[in-house]
Amino acid sequence: MQLGRSGRRSQKQKHEVDEVYFTLTRVDRSCPYLTVPGPPGAESGAPVRLGLRQRAVSSSRNPNSAGRTPNSYLTQAPVWRRSAPAQPPAPQTRHFPGRGADPALGSLPAAGLSGLCARTTGGTAQPPGARDSGASPGAQPQRHRPGCRGPPGSPVIRGPPRCREPGTAHGAQTPPPTRPNWPRRQPSRGSCALSSRQYGERPPAPPWTQPSVPRRGAATWGQEKAEYATPLGTQEARRASGGRGGVDHGDQGLSPCCGDGGARGRRRLPTFWPSGLLRLRLDSLGALPPEPSRAGRGRLFGLSVVLLKRNAGGEATPREGGPRRRWLRESCSPLPARHSRRRASWVSRWMEGAPPRMPSLPL
């Protein structure tokens, strides 16, 4: 038999090979059950139980592929493993309960048949109706369970079939499906060519950036005024915090940092002012720091410049004042916004890492 120019067999030639093979092995085409190449009892194509050392021509009980195994061409005839002592199933643990435990995975094969398993079909799924290559032919094929797709023992794939693309391994990244003519203006959507409301042009912020607790905002206008570093004890400021000294618990949830939280009658100052002494001195001097502009608050965390000067050259952080500590990098927080726990820039992230080492001497 000659091959065509492409070097592959045509359909017709494949069928020729089939015919030769079936003639050799005395298989009755109409019999979908297991048949055996050798003894004369098999000539009628009657279903036979396999002896241990015999080969099965077809393990398929699917009438569509009647006498033909998926690899029944002469070049691909399945190679059989030596029948060896059956390998015991994996020990049952909590995480791997064994194949017998889960009904979707089928039952364990009979111990005698485990040596007889085609090497070519080793780990793959068996054809739809077959349990094991040696299952008794009269038995019913396993029913299709609603929970599992495909032949039992194959991995269960969940989810709508439109996610599965034929050419891609499951879990591989594929480009997202495109919108029809996207950036073009669609008059039905409204007059705006790119309305970011409708289609997000930029993806939502990654979850660690989104404030889990909303950013500190003032509930009342009075409270907002009290939030500024204005030591003027106005009625509004005193009223906004509920009249009590100490902390506004609606505020940040900061505990009163240092000094006494201030008594009722005393002028209301922001909670994080360094100490009662400074507060008293400011009271007596009457020299008051200017109210900071709204714009500068992000950088200074709501502290006025005067306070920073008095803070012994410390950080612009409400948490921790005092002289700068070079090697305790965590003592000051360079966080840009209160709600995100990320470092401010790559520089500070780099400074947090291990300090560079001295080159070791080759000794």
Curated annotation (Swiss-Prot):
It comes from the Eukaryota. Residues 35-262 are annotated as: Disordered. Residues 56-75 have a biased composition (Polar residues). Residues 100-116 have a biased composition (Low complexity). This is Putative uncharacterized protein FRMD6-AS1. It comes from Homo sapiens. The gene is FRMD6-AS1.
